[in-house]
Amino acid sequence: FEVHTDLDFNETTGVLEIKPSGIVMEYSDFELEGSLDTKNNMDLDLSIKGTKPNFDMFIAFAPANLIPVLERYKNAGKIYFNANINGPSNKGNVPLIDVHFGASKAFLENTAKAKRIDEMGFKGHFTNGHKRRMSTMEFSLSNITAKLEEGSFLGSMMIKNFEEPEVDMKLDADFDLDFIVKFLNLKNVDNTSGNISL
């Protein structure tokens, strides 16, 4: 984890300006810029952006025990992540968090089994909402697409209110069961055949 930054602190106004900076993580790089108002409730105005030609950006946020599993798959695509953090951040205040992320023209390939998912894409969004608490959090994935060896997958998902989750999911999928078993390296599944349509 490395941070390359240029900071400018104005003692009169109490504003710390973060000039365009780089955050280097093991699997991804991000750009950070914005300001922190130290005299006004530690008011944040931050922008974090990242683009990558593969899924490493999402692997960077995965739980440590899941990373070796994800690393088994060859992958590429146009991946982006844009986050804005705005508002007071001290004395019990939580800033507004608004994140947009997604992928297009992507693929995942299990090279050991020669199984590949093509034409993957999705648009994602997360916010902690106007009240900046669990009850106003929203997470969505829209325009989820994927072309399987034999079949396809289309879908969307919306989760509202993380205290009492309301989930709205739509799927239109048609795929070969044996393909999924091989692609995911499922070991304890035998004699799989047939199609699944949702």
Regions found by a protein language model. Give the residues of each.
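Extended intrinsically disordered, low-complexity coil regions enriched in Ser, Thr, Gly, Ala
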Residues: 114-118
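Extended amphipathic, helix-rich lipid-handling scaffolds
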Residues: 1-17, 21-25, 41-109, 120-152, ...
